[in-house]
A protein has these predicted regions:
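Mg2+-dependent prenyl diphosphate-binding active-site environment of isoprenoid biosynthetic enzymes
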Residues: 12, 22, 26-273, 283-295
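N-terminal amphipathic/basic leader segments beginning at the initiator methionine
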Residues: 1-22
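Generic C-terminal helix-cap and adjacent flexible tail
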Residues: 276-279, 296-299
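Structural helix-adjacent loops and short alpha-helical linkers that scaffold large soluble proteins
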Residues: 7, 200-203, 278
């Protein structure tokens, strides 16, 4: 199976898991749950669930066991996009080629649906079946996702990003923003996949952390590049939005070609981390394919 097929299989698996976890929620057919469903299943690449599945399967964990952490991390990602798109933050009206949640359902419902997705993520991790995953590792996943999505991770990074609008920041400050805003949740996805494998997965965490940190930053560099060279129809969101908001970006700081070089260098570092795991007879091909995809994608 080539990488596009692998990614599509992950999209289908993750979407089915999300539907399964959303279906028992009360107040179906109300604007709140309709907005929740819309925000969670609006489309998207499902890269974070892919990282959960690919990492866990590398250690022989059954894919159905990985549905819970994969769906949980996507719930957090989806809620963050719903809130990022609000007028008080990035003020976007287009997401994945469709109206953003607050445009379709109103700001109040978008906020509440985002809140509900955040809490659903932790409900899934706490209660969903995970065959052969001890309580210790389940609790570790809860902690990982909480740290990655809160002040120490995604929310902290978003706050730094908002504070930096209209200001010139240096490369170190920009990397600090994105290691939190984007990278923390990517790292959590990889770590949750590893934790599902118990001690074998825990032993691999140092190499996996380096891999995740490098692809997380490369993902943001590529996003910044696409904001310059992409088009709205392909991206599914406003092209040039970062410049309009006065955000510092890697192309603005480094120039377009040096930004591309930085993305490639980060992916090369990520591959070197995988070499350590391949030397232990682990099949890292899916994680390597994702790393390559990050700098080849056009949306």
């Amino acid at each position: 199976m080539d990488f596009p097929q692998q990614l599509q299989a992950c999209v289908e698996q993750a979407n089915e898991a999300l539907r399964r976890f959303i279906a028992p929620q009360p107040f179906q057919n109300t604007p709140l749950v309709e907005a929740l469903h819309y925000g969670a299943l609006l489309g998207g690449k499902r890269l974070r669930p892919f990282l959960v599945y690919a990492t866990g399967e590398m250690f022989g964990v059954c894919r159905t066991t990985l549905d819970a952490p994969a769906a949980a991390v996507e719930c957090i990602h989806a809620y963050s996009l719903m809130h990022d798109d609000l007028p008080a933050m990035d003020d976007d009206d287009l997401r994945r080629g469709l109206p953003t949640c607050h445009i379709k359902f109103g700001e109040a419902n978008a906020i509440l649906a985002g809140d509900a997705l955040q809490t659903l993520a932790f409900s899934i991790l706490s209660d969903a079946p995970m065959v052969d995953v001890p309580d210790r590792d389940r609790l570790a996943m809860v902690s990982e996702l909480a740290q990655a999505s809160g002040v120490a991770g995604m929310c902290g990074g978003q706050a730094l990003d908002l504070q930096a609008e209209g200001q010139q920041v240096d490369l170190q400050a920009l990397e600090r923003i994105h290691r939190h805003k984007t990278g923390a949740l990517i790292r959590a996805a990889v770590r949750m996949g590893a934790l599902s494998a118990g001690e074998r997965g825990r032993a691999a965490l140092p190499a996996l952390d380096r891999y995740a940190e490098n692809i997380g930053l490369a993902f943001q560099v590529q996003d910044d590049i696409l904001d310059v060279v992409g088009d709205t129809a392909t991206l599914g969101k406003r092209q040039g939005a970062d410049q309009q908001l006065g955000k510092s970006t890697y192309p603005a700081l480094l120039g377009l070609e040096q930004a591309r070089k930085k993305a490639h260098d980060l992916i090369a570092d990520a591959r070197r981390s995988l070499d350590e795991l391949a030397a232990q007879s682990l099949d890292t091909s899916a994680l390597e394919a994702l790393a390559n995809y990050i700098i080849q994608r056009d949306k």
